[in-house]
Structure formats: structure tokens, C-alpha cells
Amino acid sequence: MPEETQTQDQPMEEEEVETFAFQAEIAQLMSLIINTFYSNKEIFLRELISNSSDALDKIRYESLTDPSKLDSGKELHINLIPNKQDRTLTIVDTGIGMTKADLINNLGTIAKSGTKAFMEALQAGADISMIGQFGVGFYSAYLVAEKVTVITKHNDDEQYAWESSAGGSFTVRTDTGEPMGRGTKVILHLKEDQTEYLEERRIKEIVKKHSQFIGYPITLFVEKERDKEVSDDEAEEKEDKEEEKEKEEKESEDKPEIEDVGSDEEEEEKKDGDKKKKKKIKEKYIDQEELNKTKPIWTRNPDDITNEEYGEFYKSLTNDWEDHLAVKHFSVEGQLEFRALLFVPRRAPFDLFENRKKKNNIKLYVRRVFIMDNCEELIPEYLNFIRGVVDSEDLPLNISREMLQQSKILKVIRKNLVKKCLELFTELAEDKENYKKFYEQFSKNIKLGIHEDSQNRKKLSELLRYYTSASGDEMVSLKDYCTRMKENQKHIYYITGETKDQVANSAFVERLRKHGLEVIYMIEPIDEYCVQQLKEFEGKTLVSVTKEGLELPEDEEEKKKQEEKKTKFENLCKIMKDILEKKVEKVVVSNRLVTSPCCIVTSTYGWTANMERIMKAQALRDNSTMGYMAAKKHLEINPDHSIIETLRQKAEADKNDKSVKDLVILLYETALLSSGFSLEDPQTHANRIYRMIKLGLGIDEDDPTADDSSAAVTEEMPPLEGDDDTSRMEEVD
């Protein structure tokens, strides 16, 4: 490129400036930030300090394995420099800095995954302070700034300047100003009505509120004036210097005035002679004050820490705008030493189960030195919503990711963290209201834990809450269910489905409800995976009411009656199986139906209808498994239902009656739908129903219709076998 060949002393800087357009979503976000009124604009400073802290974390982590990375600047700090004259606020850090490519990509041309989600949240009325959670905190600078300049130096690149007034584009150029060594300087050119953020008191207030627990010194630079007593000679010297400065700044018309002042001073000198008088002058100086001297909160005694302090630390750690729901602060001593401070947020993040998201939100420290915040081995994935810090005394400072994977120390820390998290959830469960909030947000995590963590499955199962056929609008634990079980009840009965109403009205729960047996309603897709692993609770087996072999508490008389019904309908079962062929594995007399004529159940080890629906929705499903697992369907018939009884009579009177076949297929397809399955050929089923409607309305099938296209559809309908006998069809209804 031509600009690369130009030397710095060539006055061709304009050609070195490159202009880029903001990516559409980012431009939209900036427009939203600039043109909407937000009352809590102060969060911009929290976001920029947080970004600086992240940059410092990165260079410190790199320096652990390669100390030469800090040759460009050993001190790791953040400086805040307000300038009232220029109306600028500058945030400087000695972090990792950005290359030219980083500047272009990170600040404008590549949208983060959270950009769109944040805009949707904002438009839905969410608070602007959520911005950091979506990874787009930098743009909050435009809440207070009309123009932002970013000067940055990375060890692997030259010093560059990025600049934008948010007009849909930004510029990047090589920076020829004062060399930075390494790091990033964000200069905010404040709007006229936002000068409060140049006030010392206001900056201190914001840092204390949002950033006092940042792990690097945050220093405020403020220009102040003080009185200084000096002798006349020194005062004159100082005044001369000031006059020199004025000479440079003022135009030529000011020159005589300056000369007059000088001659006056000479006269004064003559009058005073050798007398040396003391004189007070105003001296400007830069005051530096560290704003976050607070000791790391996790190293303090939990008894000395207030809820407010925990809340402030949680907010500074997570950029959350709400308080935490629960906190666990503990230390482990003995062979292994570490301290941990864990928080449960009030709500799940928008991308909780996204694969691209980092696997956990716990910062790992070694002897108060930050190491990393995305150590996957620190906590299992199902606890990825837990926020906090872990500070180990035993891990080496220069530990690498590879070493962490093999570290026995880390395995012990992980085991302890999981144990303490489960303790925290159990404590939370004692407060019904708070646990309800927790469970609404994180029930999927608990269920994922049951699927993945065999060691803690029992403890996790105690945290489960479900609606049941007897609980109304309240969710109950498995322990509550067990205390309400009937005397002769051996199993915990459950049904899986899409909604509470759907499973409550299901044919599968009819007889259980009639007998006063409580059924658990599992209505989240993850419940299917959860119960695959959770076989029993407190010695009671979990039994799906939609699978074959359902055993209900029965007395001898009921068993005898059931056997008689099986014998009576044995022939009909055989005929139905022959008609349905491979569609079902078998046809049996049901002991679970009361008002429905029939239902489809699955084999003990096959998928339920709900699981089949979930698996069909998987984009990367294995069709061979689909065929194997989904094929095991059993048709159960209700021997007490008039439709089934009449069908038995028809079949026994004339087993070659052609209407029987069509009715059996219609019953099977309807049972598929009512049992939660989908039809392979819905149109054929619909045509059968239309034919039934015609018969019910007494319309002659051969009647010509006004619309030729309708006639064509009628021709394609599958014929109702034996439809010459309409009266027999009506008899079944």
C-alpha cells in the first residue's frame, strides 16, 4: 500500500487515513444509543474500565509464560484523565493493546453475537446498563461522547488511532503522536451537556459504585491549584515563564501590554532594592489518587462483609444491573488451600446454552494474581451460570491450559465447588419464593446435571420441582410426591409432553387419576433426557405412563376381570394387528384407559412420543437411530369403550367385513395424534375424515361438485372399504 512507503515527515497524513463503514447492526445500535434518552449514562465508565481490566488480564496472562511481553511496560494500571479545557475524558490502560486488524474488526466491522440480542432487549424495555453482558460495552461511550478517539499499541504492531463521531463510519490511521509503549487510550470528546463526567467528585462516585473491585490500580489525574509562598525573584521567574507562554498564544496586538508589565516590574525592583519579600502565587499541579485500594473481598472474613458489599462486588464482577439471588463465600484449608466466592444471578443470560459461549464465568486467581476467566475444568457445564472467583494458594502462577487439564489440584477444587454449589441450592430451596425464582431460570441446568453428573445425581434430584395431577398451580418436589403416595403404590408415575394442559388431558392419565394416583407432569424437552438417567428416587422406580407394561395397584378381583377382558378381546387384537401389520409391534387390551377408545404406547426402552418429536426436530439427527428407536409402538384398546365393543362385534360377525379395516386404520391414526405422535401421511388421514363427514351429512359420495378441482381431490381420496353399508358406519359412531 502506498501509505506504508511514506515516511513520517512527509505531510501526507490524509492519504494514510482509511475510512470504514460500521457493520449494519453496529450502526443501528449506535443510533439507538445516541438518539434515545437514558438516565443512567454513567455506566459508560464502568464498561470502559471493564474493557481495560480485560486487556490487562490478557497481557498479564501472556507474560506468565513469556515475561518479555512486559518489556514494553512493566506496570499494569488504568489511568483516568479529565481535561476541562478540551472537554475530554481519557481512559488509559497498559493492557495488551490492539493491532490494526483488531481495531477494524472489534470496533466496527464485525458484530458480536450479542449486538442484535441487546438491541431487541433494549427495544423491549431492558436497561441500558445490561450492555456489558452482550459484549458491546465499548459503544456505551456514545452515551456521553460526540466523538471517540482510540489510540492503541500492541506488541506485534505499530501505534494506531481509531476515530468516529458515530456517523455510520470510522477512520483508522497510523498514530505519530507520543509513543505509548503498549496499551490503549480511549479519548472521549464529551457532549456539551455531559461535562459532569469531568468533575473529580462524579468520577470518584462512579468508580466507587461500579469498579472499586477491579484488580488493577485505577488512578485519577486531576489538575489542581494551590497557594505557594515564594520570594519575589522566584515569583518573577514564574511570571516571566507565564508571560512567555502568553506571548506564544496571543496575537501581535497583545505585545505592548506584556512589555508594560515588564517595565513596571523593573521599577518595583528599583524601589525595593535589595529587600526580599515573600509572595503567594497560585501553582498548578497534577494530583494523582488511586480510587480502588479495597482489599480483594474474597480474602476477607465473611462475617465482616455486608450484603451491600457483596452486591457491589457482584455487580462489578458481572456487569449485571440487578442484585445477585444468593452467595456462597468459603475457604478450604488443609492439604489444599483455596478461597472462593460464588454467586447465583437473578436471571439466566440470554445465551446460556450457546456452544460458542465460554463454558463458565468463574475467574481463576493464583495467590491474588488473575490467571483466566474461561477455565473449562473449573466447574461442570451445567453450573455455567454460577459467577464468582476462585483463588488458589497451590497452583503455579505460570500454569498453562494443558497443565490445568491434568492438574489434580484443579480436580479437587472442582469437586469442592460443585459440592458448595449444591449446598447453596439446598439452602435456597428452604425459601420457597426465592427458590421459585431460581428454578424458573435454572431448572434446565439442574436437569442437565442429572443427565451428566452421576456422582451428584441423588442430591440434584432433590432439587427438582414439577407440576403434578394433584398439585394445581404449585410445583412440588419428588420428596413431596413420595409422602403422598398410596399405601400399595410401588412406583412414581410421570408423563412427558409439551404443555401442562396437554398432558393433563392425555388418555394415559385417565385411569391413574380415577384411582387417585398422582402423576408428575414433565413438560420441558430436557426432562426426557433427565429421566433416562434418573431411574429411581428414594427406592421408588420412576415409571412412564406412556410406555408398555404399566402396573397399577390392583386387588385380586380387578386382576381377574382384566384377564377375562383380555380373553374376550383376544381375537379383535389379532385382527387389528393383521390389518396394521408393521405399523405396530402388538395390539393389547389396556388397563390405563377410561374414556378414550385406544392409545399408542411405546416399548419400555423405546422413545416416548415426546422424545420422538424432539429427535425429529434435531437438525443433525441420525436417521438409522430414528428408525430403530421410533418403531416400537403398541396399540392398546379400551375394552369398556362402545367403539371397541361394537368393532369386536362387527369383526366376529364377519371377519372379512371391509369396513373393519378402514375403521381400524382410522382408529390407529387418531390414536397416534391423541398420543402425541405425528402422522407420516396427514393428507390421507384428512381425506378419510372428510369421507366420514360426508357420510355423516348424508351426502352421496358420487354427487358432482360445483368446483372441478374439488372433484379431482375427491377422486384421489382413499375409498372407504364396505361403504355401501352406511348404516353400519353410523352405528359405530
UniProtKB/Swiss-Prot annotation:
Region span, Required for homodimerization:
683-733
Q: Which UniProt keywords apply?
A: Acetylation, ATP-binding, Cell membrane, Chaperone, Cytoplasm, Hydrolase, Membrane, Mitochondrion, Nucleotide-binding, Nucleus, Phosphoprotein, S-nitrosylation, Stress response, Ubl conjugation
**Region of interest called Essential for interaction with SGTA and TTC1, as start-end residue ranges on this chain:** 730-733
Motif stretch (TPR repeat-binding): 724-733
* GO biological process terms held by the UniProt record: activation of innate immune response; cellular response to heat; cellular response to virus; positive regulation of defense response to virus by host; positive regulation of interferon-beta production; positive regulation of nitric oxide biosynthetic process; protein folding; protein stabilization
- List compositional bias (Acidic residues) regions by residue number: 230-246, 256-269
**UniProt modified residues of type Phosphoserine:** S231, S252, S263, S454, S477, S642
Modified after translation how? Answer: ISGylated.
One Gene Ontology MF term: unfolded protein binding
Name its cellular compartments. Answer: Nucleus; Cytoplasm; Melanosome; Cell membrane
Q: Which residues carry this modification: Phosphothreonine?
A: T5, T7
What binding partners and quaternary form does the record give? Homodimer. Identified in NR3C1/GCR steroid receptor-chaperone complexes formed at least by NR3C1, HSP90AA1 and a variety of proteins containing TPR repeats such as FKBP4, FKBP5, PPID, PPP5C or STIP1. Forms a complex containing HSP90AA1, TSC1 and TSC2; TSC1 is required to recruit TCS2 to the complex. The closed form interacts (via the middle domain and TPR repeat-binding motif) with co-chaperone TSC1 (via C-terminus). Interacts with TOM34. Interacts with TERT; the interaction, together with PTGES3, is required for correct assembly and stabilization of the TERT holoenzyme complex.
Free-text comment on this protein's domains from its UniProt entry: The TPR repeat-binding motif mediates interaction with TPR repeat-containing proteins like the co-chaperone STUB1.
Q: What does this protein do?
A: Molecular chaperone that promotes the maturation, structural maintenance and proper regulation of specific target proteins involved for instance in cell cycle control and signal transduction. Undergoes a functional cycle that is linked to its ATPase activity which is essential for its chaperone activity. This cycle probably induces conformational changes in the client proteins, thereby causing their activation. Interacts dynamically with various co-chaperones that modulate its substrate recognition, ATPase cycle and chaperone function.
What HAMAP family would the database entry show? HSP90
| Protein name per UniProt | Heat shock protein HSP 90-alpha
